């Protein structure tokens, strides 16, 4: 019964939360504000009205609406005394300051004053707003603001200053030398959110000056595991390029110690919950790690196949690129690429593509049955045809398995699925052409009349034409069947019918030096003349020109020139392969298979003679501690903070009776009650004596102040030189002041 009420309570809470979310999401839609209402609220004297208007404007911005019309009315609120209004105005300015630089200049002075605000978030937003105003006239002011903010005590402000450097540089590149010095300062930071921003700025301002990173390399590697997931993605882009250009290429027996340090730091990416971080870590490991450590990227990538479809598809594209070069990494994980019911069409195609690259003689007993099942049972024809293509590729690469695959492909020619028949015909064209056998050609000739797909007919006629000497008796019958439907065939099939007819005619009349086509009455000549007459009325001018060319050649069938032109093989022994560039994994260009703006390939490993000495990276490795409550670093000038332990932890509170003991709660004996009263009275006496001593110290202090006022300048100088303090040191007082005992009567 109690369990039932518990679940009813949970159900009620969920329903209430749903209603609250629904009402909050519809708050702006239900209270739609017109243009005149917004202007009235923005110019009203009420802070509540201004907040309502700005909140509505920001909500519309999040829905993709252009709210730049209200820029003049919003920008003047930047001087509001309400901090919430100023914060929202800063957010608005971040969006539209770049598009309205002239009006944004009105807020420069006010925004500059907020750089001294007590709230770090306000200071951070202020430097972001100032750098977003695209006016060259204030670039010097922005540079001074950056110089101030890179030494701010709050790491969030220093991070915003680092990002502001990129905007300052894009507006005026002449400040590059000064900005490089600021980047060096930020790279020496101890905060894990500042260093990634500095690396991003480095990539924008001076990516070619890798010597800037040298002294901070070990510090960056130390801070890397502490960075958040998104920052790791940004930092790895620079670190991979730095390692490829300044560190020696790893080898299996030994790897450079600095590269080992980086690889150990990158391993933290594999435990992230963010897919992009895992992919970035796998990408860095793939391009930096030695071959004996490459297996570490397999499990994290396979784990991403359990994510949502878009992540699954993207990961499969990257795995496909890895398998293309190093298939042995995934040979033990074949079942991870078997199709499941929830896979999308793109996912299915990518998985079959990966299986085709992993397929070999050793694992064919596992993969081939899966491919045959997909061919016969998958509802998507494109997936089934891709499986046929994988089967044909495997048969081409493994001669020992070719006969069994050929039998399957020949049977697939009778399929009603045009895509399956097309892929089967394309695979057969390569397999039979490289190893022509009479039994296969006889089967193709016998099944030609049942074929319905133009591609299958075209491939069949091409194979028979190329190997016409193997089955010379069957060719006239095939040609006779083909010309029956000549007028209804596609242009591709018509070309092959013409090729077959002219070859058959030249071979049949090779002993005759010259003849008249119209006077011949044998079967081959009649078929050839019939084909020429059909082409004469065809709509394709290219086909008509080719027929006239072959007719002229056929007039001298025994000449060497005619035989070389007509009978020479015109087929390509290599299968048609769609060319694709070798894009780097972890890039959008690989997903789209085309160049995307901003794509940068991974540089090759630098030559050993061009590497800098290891001494250039001998920088400071220690990282200052970070305050876990504020996120700020402890100052270098502050006294060292030692870790607490049972050996060095001492509590000096003076008299232990001064500490308030917790009151006993519960039943007490009479002796225990009087003992507690005695202890309370002693605490009261201590409190009275403490207050009296404090009063005496106050009187002494006031008397000394009166003496200082009455002293002469000479006496003041003497007092300053001695600078003696008469009051007790603060360290001599108890750490915890005793609370007054209200129970003592």
From Swiss-Prot:
Modification sites for Phosphoserine: 638
Membrane topology annotation: Peripheral membrane protein
Keyword DNA damage recorded: no
Keyword presence, Phosphoprotein: yes
GO CC term (a single one): nucleus
GO BP annotations listed: Golgi to vacuole transport; intracellular protein transport
Subcellular location: Golgi apparatus; Cytoplasmic vesicle, Clathrin-coated vesicle membrane
Acidic residues: compositionally biased ranges: 680-718
Keyword line: Cytoplasmic vesicle, Golgi apparatus, Membrane, Phosphoprotein, Protein transport, Transport
Chief localization: Golgi
Region feature (Disordered): 674-745
Entries under Pfam families matching the protein: Adaptin_N
Family: Belongs to the adaptor complexes large subunit family.
Subunit structure of this chain's protein: Adaptor protein complex 3 (AP-3) is a heterotetramer composed of 2 large adaptins (apl5 and apl6), a medium adaptin (apm3) and a small adaptin (aps3).
Functional summary from the UniProt entry: Adaptins are components of the adaptor complexes which link clathrin to receptors in coated vesicles. Clathrin-associated protein complexes are believed to interact with the cytoplasmic tails of membrane proteins, leading to their selection and concentration. Beta adaptin is a subunit of the plasma membrane adaptor.
Protein name: AP-3 complex subunit beta
Gene giving rise to this polypeptide: apl6
